[in-house]
Amino acid sequence: MAGGVTGGSAEGWSKRFEEGLHPVIERFNASISFDITLLQEDLDGSIAHARMLGECGVISLEEAAQLEGGLEKIRSEAAAGEFQPGLVDEDVHFAVERRLIALLGPVGKKLHTGRSRNDQVGTDLRLWLRRRLDDLDCELERFQNALLTQAESHRQTLIPGYTHLQRAQPLCLAHHLLAYIEMIQRDRDRLKDVRGRVNISPLGAAALAGTSVPIDRQNTAAALGFECIYANSLDAVSDRDFAVEYTAAASLVMVHLSRLAEEVIFWASEEFAFVRLSDRCATGSSLMPQKKNPDVPELVRGKCGRVFGHLQGLLTMIKGLPLAYNKDFQEDKEALFDTVRTTKDCVEAMSILMEQGLEFCSERLAAAVESDFSNATDVADYLVAKGVPFREAYQLVGAVVKRCLDEGILLCDLSLEQWQEFHSAIAEDLHEALAPKRVVAVRISEGGTGFDRVEEQLRHWRSRLDSGVS
């Protein structure tokens, strides 16, 4: 920001400065290009502060009303596109104050009584993030509903289950989708926990030591909807834990989105062909006319790196800062703003993908689970039920699979006589036990993929989401 001799933003500084900032340094120092994002929150915080000053007798009630009117005038100007801060303002706080003084004259200069930009920006940032946390929770709930709707449509559809990206055991497709609903619920729980630590007011901590002005911090905290105030003024102006916590929680949201995105990319390939992408959620190639590319999940997967990078950047920025406020904190905003925007955009895109962007190919999925050895564990379980020790059964089934691979056949292709070459306990009922739907149905342990257990979870989640319980 310019110094005392340049005019304009000089109103923000004391007469200690005789020379203005070098133009390059002025641009380097300014944050108005991005912290203008906090304008509405800055106005809200300033109105609460002005009212409190009036109620505490620091300024007259008439002056407080004038300040509030001026701040609302700025809000109206911003909505009409008439409030145009420039580099001379340095940041959103000086931009508002400069315009307020232009509107009200000397009364406008009283707004900053009893506060500093240090507690002011912390207040603005918390108000802004609190609102975005609520927005993100709504988007995550929508995503859960999209997943649940898909799951409800595939109660009896089977899909290969994988470990190490190798066919493992067949699953109910609804069970697979329900796993992501559980992940997203953990994300929502984490973000709710973060919100509690966002919702603490630093306003009134001033620069670092509090103020001699007889203000009422509880008053402004209540007016702005904060649950409580920071107990220590140094901590109040230097705390950015909440920004790190949000970015860490958002990183986990992105991890979960990326895992599903990766699966959709696989599923949409010709090698899998488990899903068909709609024209509304896919793009083509500029060269190859046959292509339909899964751009949505690919972008979600790619954007994870941005959010992870912001988390690392915030941690690195904060780790060496002595108390209390340091200009380094200016770097928190772009990282936080981009994390919020990127995460919300990715959740919204994946919701649309689930709602109208893909169709599961039930026939292809059925064929997939009938063409592998993912029922091998059930042979072992069958033998265990016949009294064979599990490890012995495990070794025996491995030998059977080896023989089938050598002969190019599946377990279901073996005759009873061939099975009994391996163990005399095997009877005709084995073939029924190997049927894919039977393999899934018998997984009856709580949380398992058995159809009855899946129905329980579908009912649970439908009731929970319909009732709005977060």
Swiss-Prot record:
It catalyses: 2-(N(omega)-L-arginino)succinate = fumarate + L-arginine. Belongs to the lyase 1 family. Argininosuccinate lyase subfamily. GO terms for cellular component: cytosol. GO terms for biological process: arginine biosynthetic process via ornithine; L-arginine biosynthetic process. It is an enzyme of class 4 (lyase). Keywords: Amino-acid biosynthesis, Arginine biosynthesis, Cytoplasm, Lyase. It is found in: Cytoplasm. Gene3D superfamilies: Fumarase/aspartase (C-terminal domain), Fumarase/aspartase (Central domain), Fumarase/aspartase (N-terminal domain). InterPro entries: Arg_succ_lyase_C, Argininosuccinate_lyase, Fumarase/histidase_N, Fumarate_lyase_CS, Fumarate_lyase_fam, Fumarate_lyase_N, L-Aspartase-like. The lineage of its organism: Bacteria, Bacillati, Cyanobacteriota, Cyanophyceae, Synechococcales. This is Argininosuccinate lyase. Pathway: Amino-acid biosynthesis; L-arginine biosynthesis; L-arginine from L-ornithine and carbamoyl phosphate: step 3/3. The gene is argH. Its EC number is 4.3.2.1. GO terms for molecular function: argininosuccinate lyase activity. Its main location: cytoplasm. The keyword Amino-acid biosynthesis applies.
